[in-house]
């Protein structure tokens, strides 16, 4: 008869205690990481559209890439709603995280203040003369696919990481960069296209990013 198995003691008692950073120190460390990897600093397409030096083909391709970013991200918003740490507050009005993401999702879908955000991106491509079938069959760049689904990996893994990756590192940084205003003005001035999507995002991402900063300090 084989020897009976033994329940192994896996507790590592010789390990030192890990001390969490203070909120201020953690946020400062996070800000340094975000600053070192800020995509808006190295992006050459946005300023080229802003000053009118981008070809129309580049402008169209950027619009198609942006459509898929919105198409893939929007269905993930309910994860932030359902995973919010105060989702079971007495009422939604008593919550912060839950109420914020519920409003954010409603806004993205066109039920709160602005038009549906994915539809705005479709209208952006139509304004540039891109047929719907071309948009439907377009294959986004690997960089677009990788960046979107890396972010969604964190959204799916935990609320805290989703808040940090999407709300703080993306929406807040996007709002601070001023990219939406640059694109709105550049497209209107140099390509005779007025894009509602960028008009909306020039204020919406700033507002959402500010709220994400406050929520980050509360988790």
Model-derived features with residue positions:
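Non-heme di-metal
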Residues: 2-219
């Amino acid at each position: 008869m084989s020897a009976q198995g033994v329940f192994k003691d896996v507790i590592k008692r010789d390990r030192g205690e890990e001390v969490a950073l203070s909120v201020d120190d953690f946020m400062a460390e996070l800000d340094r990481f975000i600053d070192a990897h800020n995509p808006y600093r190295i992006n050459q397409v946005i300023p080229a559209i802003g000053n009118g030096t981008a070809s129309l083909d580049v402008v169209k391709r950027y619009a198609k890439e942006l459509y898929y970013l919105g198409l893939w991200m929007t269905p993930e918003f309910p994860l932030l709603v359902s995973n919010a740490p105060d989702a079971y507050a007495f009422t939604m009005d008593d919550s912060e995280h839950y109420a914020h993401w519920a409003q954010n999702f409603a806004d993205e879908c066109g039920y709160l203040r602005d038009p549906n955000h994915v539809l705005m991106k479709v209208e952006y491509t139509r304004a540039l003369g891109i047929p719907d079938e071309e948009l439907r069959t377009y294959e986004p760049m690997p960089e677009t696919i990788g960046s979107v689904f890396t972010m969604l990996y964190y959204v799916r893994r935990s609320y805290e990481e989703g808040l940090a990756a999407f709300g703080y590192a993306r929406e807040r940084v996007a709002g601070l960069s001023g990219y939406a205003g640059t694109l709105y003005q550049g497209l209107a001035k140099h390509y005779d296209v007025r894009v509602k999507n960028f008009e909306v995002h020039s204020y919406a991402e700033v507002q959402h990013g500010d709220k994400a900063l406050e929520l980050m300090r509360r988790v």
